[in-house]
């Protein structure tokens, strides 16, 4: 059975101001750039593919809205246009979907290069250019994709909601 475009897993994240976090701002506004977002006890850790890191404090509003994720998020803008010729921001879970689904193991993916994520456990590589499909290693599920709602430079707020 083919995998649906969006994951059936509930996810939610609201971050603001995006412009205060260079790796996140660049990933949302530059085709071919991605970053990861991990939740720490008092802040979010945002890391770009080239290893640059930034933190964003968890505000009372963000804590109240209760972020939900499996392992974190991968956020960015593909350099491959959709069928309308548009380059839209996308969000995936940071968890390896195959280790999580088959073994119930929450293994975080790492950047293999700017547009590829690697699972250090099962050695599958996932393309951020092609919708999160497996491009190396044993065949399997593509990355869990989530909806980005309401991001614009004017609002300066990122909302991931599934």
Which ranges hold each PLM region?
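N-terminal pre-ligand scaffold of iron-sulfur
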Residues: 2-110, 144-162
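Short Cys/His-rich metal-coordination motifs, predominantly Zn2+-binding knuckles/fingers
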Residues: 99, 122-123
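Secreted/processed peptides and extracellular or luminal domains of membrane proteins
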Residues: 102, 125-128
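Short, solvent-exposed loop/turn and secondary-structure capping segments
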Residues: 107-108, 130-132
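Short cysteine/histidine-rich metal-coordination sites, predominantly Zn2+-binding motifs
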Residues: 111-122, 133-146
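A sequence/structural signal for flexible, mid-protein segments enriched
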Residues: 118, 125, 159-161
